[in-house]
Amino acid sequence: MELNVINTQGKAVGSLQVSDALFGREYNEALVHQVVTAFLANARSGNRAQLTRAEVKHSTKKPFRQKGTGNARAGMTSTPNRRGGGRAFPNKPDENFTQKVNRKMYRAGIATILSQLVRDERLIVVDDLSVASPKTKEFVGAVQPMGLEQALFITNELSENLYLSSRNLPNMLVIEAVQADPYSLLRFKKTVITRDAVKQLEEQWA
């Protein structure tokens, strides 16, 4: 398979022969769903927690007398059926959200996503991506000719200038090829990959 290569001005500068195993794979929706779901689940810190009725700071005083009020009897205000009381079955930090996906499936998922990006014309290959200084306006000026509103940029090596100049843009993300993940590839409208990063992705996933 052959992909067109452009420069940051949006002009064609040649083409690049790429692996069909990575960029020409058939789309498998079930596989993509499983890989993305597992990636997001494994990224969870698992630190959510609520208090039980024993852990809530409440007085153990009886809220009202046992008989004569017409209300159901009550012993304390920390019970789960009262406002401000503890949870009956609370979540605890030791909960494990890990989902196992073997390497073969994960590799196939990445290849499926990249192939679909090519078919949807959401993948752009550029010859190089660099900025002279760590300023946001430098990065915006470099990529503005390509007309990108929301994009993921993948480079073979993330320089300090490139990182610092792009980190303040909410709709742009610059990562190295080794950091590419299924969620980020699907999250952005466009994915811009440098020529060297394509080769690195092929070595890693093809």
Curated annotation (Swiss-Prot):
Q: Print the keywords alphabetically.
A: Ribonucleoprotein, Ribosomal protein, RNA-binding, rRNA-binding
An example GO CC term for this entry is:
ribosome
Q: Does the keyword Chaperone apply?
A: no
- Stretch list, region Disordered: 51-96
Specify whether RNA-binding is a keyword of the entry: yes
InterPro entries per the UniProt record, alphabetical: Ribosomal_uL4 (IPR002136), Ribosomal_uL4-like (IPR013005), Ribosomal_uL4_dom_sf (IPR023574)
GO biological process terms, alphabetically, are: translation
Q: Which domain of life is it from?
A: Bacteria
Q: Name one GO molecular function term.
A: structural constituent of ribosome
Give the function comment from the record.
One of the primary rRNA binding proteins, this protein initially binds near the 5'-end of the 23S rRNA. It is important during the early stages of 50S assembly. It makes multiple contacts with different domains of the 23S rRNA in the assembled 50S subunit and ribosome. Forms part of the polypeptide exit tunnel.
NCBIfam families in alphabetical order: rplD_bact (TIGR03953)
The family assignment reads: Belongs to the universal ribosomal protein uL4 family.
Subunit structure of this chain's protein: Part of the 50S ribosomal subunit.
Name the chain's protein: Large ribosomal subunit protein uL4
- Please report the organism this UniProt entry assigns to the protein: Chromobacterium violaceum (strain ATCC 12472 / DSM 30191 / JCM 1249 / CCUG 213 / NBRC 12614 / NCIMB 9131 / NCTC 9757 / MK)
Upper lineage is:
Bacteria, Pseudomonadati, Pseudomonadota, Betaproteobacteria, Neisseriales
